[in-house]
Amino acid sequence: MAGSSLPRRALGRRLRGYRVRAEKSQLIAAGLHIELSPQSIGRMEDGQKVKICTSQIRDLLDLYRIPNPSDDRDEIFLPWKEVKDQALAAKLAGTTKGWWQAYTDQYEPHFDHYVGLEAAATHLTTHQVVLLPGLLQTAGYRRAISLARDSGLSPAALERRLELVAHRRVRLKDPGFRVDILLSEGVLRHTPGGRSVLADQLEHILELIGSQPNVSIRVLPMDAGSHLGLLVQSFTLFEFPPLASHLVEPPVIFVEGYEGGLYLEQSETIDRHRRAITDIQRVALTEVDTKQLVQKIAKEYGV
């Protein structure tokens, strides 16, 4: 897709791996060879957009002692070709940025990366213990959360944040985007914005449950007993399709905190979170039983 961060992520992840293997610092790589700042090298390795040309990529590979020719070089130039092809296609279409980047004035810096991953993923699994995930939030629910975080938001800024959430929800209608949402029961009982806001939010969830084959919503009841969901904080697992070059990008775990977000890519960490997901799914209600529980809670709030 135009604006997808996936090829840039593949490029940056591999360049970082080669740099670490060659025991080169970002400063050396930038200062001695391609005249980029260390910050730019870091952004590139994080999969962010950086102005760089093919000759600079070659210079980096020479610095990292990557033989020419070699499979290691191919693993750089395959995603690099996709980055360039994507940029050209976007330029011809007049869409050189991802749609979400029109809202950069309305979210934290780390969230640009999050929405890019969300747009590129084909499977998202999220476990939430306090608040509903953005993909489920109604305008009223999102408004209450935004004002809780920043009570001084102008009406115009608040409206743009609501537009962003609405735009993100469109992906739920994509049959190629599988979404598994696991919610602690307490999430359905928090009342940001008051009882009427929660009532509308619960009604929205009831409309979604079972209505789209690519979206699963399941609740962990309070009486579920012991399970790993009691020990892990809220997190989201992103999984991605193969690139056009058939290279496969590993999954990413996102953990959000009050001061920012944490992106985890180590295979051991991914495996631990997969085990947590399996254990949470073991004790979560079926979608049928989830709907019955949501209906019960909704009646308490006037739905």
Residue ranges of model-derived segments:
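Short acidic (Asp/Glu) and glycine-rich catalytic loops that position anionic groups and cofactors
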Residues: S37-S40, T54-L60, V252-E256, H273-R274
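Short amphipathic alpha-helical surface micro-motifs
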Residues: S5, I41, D105-E108, Y114-E118, ...
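Interdomain hinge/linker segments and adjacent boundary elements that couple functional modules
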Residues: A2-R16, R21, D46, K51-H190, ...
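A broad, structural surface signal
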Residues: R13, G17-V20, L27, Q39, ...
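A ubiquitous short alpha-helical element
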Residues: G42-G47, G261-L262
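Short alpha-helical DNA-recognition segment
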Residues: E23-R43
